[in-house]
C-alpha cells in the first residue's frame, strides 16, 4: 500500500518546540507512551483489523529523513536554533522503539518506549496513520461529498460572523489543530487551503508544519501536556514540577512561544504556581479541558489580582470546539482578552462518520509514572493509579473521575 506519511514535517509544530527543549535541557530522558481509543464502542469495525497495515506504515515512517528544503524552512523560524536543525539533519525514527500488537483484551495496543528525543516524535504520525487506515476502509464518494458540504457551510458561517463584527471589535481568530484526528492528509490540506483562501482575516494558521510550509501560512503551537508531565519525573520536587517546566521553557525561548497549558493537574493547581513572574512573562494561556467559561473567568480574576491588564494577554481555546462554540466564547471574552481558537476534529474530520477519539500519551519517564489530571472527566490519563492518587494528594485535587 502507498505510504501515508511522506514527510517528517507532517506533524504539529509543538513537537519541534518541545523536542528542542528536551534536547537542550534533558536529552537523556527515557520515556514510555501508550495508545488509547476512548470510543471503541463507536467504531464501525475493530481497530485491530488495521494492525498489519499499521506495521507496514510504521516500517515506512522509520525510513524517512528530513529533506534539505524542510531543514531550511525550520531554520527560518526564529525560535528554532541552528544546532537543533543540525540534530534533525541526522534524525531518523527507530523502528525498535515502537510496537503495535493486540493486547490481552483483543484491542489494538501501541507502545512506544525509548529515549524521549526519539519517542515523543512518533505520536502525531501514528495517530494520523491510524485514522487514515481506519477511514480508508469505509471511504466512499458520498462521504467526501458530505465533508465538502459541511466545509462550505463552515466557510459561509465564518463569513456571517465577519459581517456581524463591529469595526472596533477584536478579530475572531481560528487555527487548524486537526492533524492527529484528520480524515486524511489530502482532506486536511483541502480544508486548510479553503480556510486560508476564503477567510484569510479569520484563519490564523495551522499546527501542521508541512502544510504551513506548502501553503505559506503561519505554523501555530507552543507546548503539550507531555512537556509538563515529564517534569513530574525529573530532578525536581513533585510539588514544583509545573514551575520547573515553565521556567525551563522561559530559559529556552526568552519570550517566544508564550502560551502556557493549564490542565496537567487542573486550572486551580496551575494558577497557584502561575505567579506574577510567569503571568508577566507568558503571553497567555491555553484551555484544553473543563468548562471554558469558568476557566476563562478564573484566568481573568487571577490576572486582575496580579494587577495585569488582561487585554495584553491571550486565551487560546482548543478543547472539542466547533465554530458556533468558538464564536460564543469569542463574544464572551473579546472585551477582556485577546482570544484565539484551535479547532481539530471538527475541521479535519467532519465527514458524517463518527471520528475516532484516539490518544497516544506519555505515561512514564525515567522509570517513574507520570499522569495528567484533567479538568474534564474522562480525559485524565495514567497507567498507575497509585501515583495518580499521590499526585492528587500533593496538589489537593478531589477525585472526580476515573483515569483511563
UniProtKB/Swiss-Prot annotation:
SUPFAM superfamilies listed in its UniProt record: Nicotinate/Quinolinate PRTase C-terminal domain-like, Nicotinate/Quinolinate PRTase N-terminal domain-like
Gene Ontology MF terms in the entry: nicotinate phosphoribosyltransferase activity
Pathway: Cofactor biosynthesis; NAD(+) biosynthesis; nicotinate D-ribonucleotide from nicotinate: step 1/1
Cystine bridges: none
Phosphohistidine, modified sites: 225
TM region(s), chain numbering: none
Protein EC: 6.3.4.21
GO biological process: NAD biosynthetic process via the salvage pathway
Modification comment: Transiently phosphorylated on a His residue during the reaction cycle. Phosphorylation strongly increases the affinity for substrates and increases the rate of nicotinate D-ribonucleotide production. Dephosphorylation regenerates the low-affinity form of the enzyme, leading to product release.
Annotated CDD domains: PncB_like
One GO cellular component term: cytosol
Record's keyword terms, sorted: Ligase, Phosphoprotein, Pyridine nucleotide biosynthesis
Reactions mediated catalytically: nicotinate + 5-phospho-alpha-D-ribose 1-diphosphate + ATP + H2O = nicotinate beta-D-ribonucleotide + ADP + phosphate + diphosphate
Pfam family, one: NAPRTase_N
Domain of life: Bacteria
The family this protein is said to belong to: Belongs to the NAPRTase family.
Role played: Catalyzes the synthesis of beta-nicotinate D-ribonucleotide from nicotinate and 5-phospho-D-ribose 1-phosphate at the expense of ATP.
Protein name: Nicotinate phosphoribosyltransferase
Native source species: Acinetobacter baumannii (strain ATCC 17978 / DSM 105126 / CIP 53.77 / LMG 1025 / NCDC KC755 / 5377)
Gene: pncB
Amino acid at each position: 500500500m502507498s505510504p501515508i506519511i511522506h514527510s517528517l514535517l507532517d506533524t504539529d509544530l509543538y513537537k519541534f518546540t518541545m523536542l528542542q527543549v528536551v534536547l537542550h535541557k534533558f536529552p537523556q530522558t527515557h520515556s514510555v507512551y501508550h495508545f488509547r481509543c476512548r470510543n471503541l464502542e463507536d467504531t464501525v469495525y475493530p481497530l485491530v483489523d488495521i494492525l498489519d497495515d499499521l506495521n507496514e506504515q510504521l516500517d515506512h515512517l522509520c525510513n524517512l529523513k528530513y529533506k534539505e528544503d524542510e531543514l531550511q524552512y525550520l531554520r527560518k523560524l526564529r525560535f528554532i536554533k541552528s544546532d537543533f536543525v543540525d540534530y534533525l539533519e541526522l534524525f531518523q525514527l527507530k523502528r525498535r522503539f515502537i510496537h503495535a500488537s493486540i493486547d490481552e483484551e483483543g484491542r489494538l495496543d501501541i507502545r512506544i518506549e525509548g529515549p524521549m528525543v526519539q519517542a515523543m516524535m512518533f505520536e502525531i504520525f501514528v495517530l494520523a496513520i491510524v485514522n487514515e487506515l481506519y477511514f480508508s476502509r469505509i471511504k466512499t464518494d458520498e462521504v467526501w461529498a458530505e465533508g465538502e458540504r459541511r466545509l462550505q457551510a463552515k466557510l459561509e458561517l465564518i463569513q456571517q460572523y465577519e459581517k456581524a463584527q463591529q469595526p472596533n471589535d477584536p478579530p475572531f481568530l481560528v487555527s487548524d489543530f486537526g492533524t492527529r484526528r484528520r480524515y486524511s492528509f489530502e482532506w486536511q490540506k483541502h480544508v486548510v487551503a479553503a480556510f486560508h483562501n476564503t477567510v484569510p482575516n479569520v484563519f490564523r494558521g495551522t499546527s501542521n508544519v508541512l502544510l504551513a510550509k506548502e501553503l505559506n501560512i503561519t505554523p501555530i503551537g507552543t507546548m503539550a501536556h507531555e512537556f509538563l508531565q515529564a517534569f513530574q519525573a525529573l530532578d525536581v520536587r513533585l510539588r514544583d514540577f509545573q514551575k520547573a517546566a515553565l521556567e525551563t521553557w522561559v530559559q529556552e525561548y526568552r519570550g517566544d512561544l508564550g502560551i502556557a497549558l493549564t490542565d496537567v493537574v487542573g486550572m486551580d493547581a496551575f494558577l497557584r504556581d502561575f505567579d506574577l513572574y510567569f503571568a508577566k512573562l507568558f503571553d497567555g494561556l491555553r484551555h484544553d479541558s473543563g468548562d471554558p467559561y469558568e476557566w476563562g473567568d478564573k484566568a481573568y480574576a487571577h490576572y486582575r489580582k496580579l494587577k495585569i491588564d488582561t487585554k495584553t494577554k491571550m486565551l487560546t481555546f482548543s478543547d472539542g470546539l466547533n465554530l458556533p462554540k468558538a464564536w460564543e466564547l469569542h463574544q464572551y471574552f473579546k472585551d477582556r482578552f485577546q482570544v484565539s481558537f484551535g479547532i481539530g476534529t471538527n475541521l479535519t474530520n467532519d465527514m458524517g462518520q463518527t471520528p475516532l477519539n484516539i490518544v497516544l500519551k506519555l505515561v512514564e519517564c525515567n522509570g517513574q509514572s507520570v499522569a495528567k489530571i484533567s479538568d474534564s472527566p474522562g480525559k485524565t490519563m495514567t497507567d498507575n493509579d497509585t501515583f495518580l492518587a499521590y499526585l492528587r494528594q500533593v496538589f489537593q485535587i478531589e477525585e472526580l473521575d476515573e483515569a483511563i
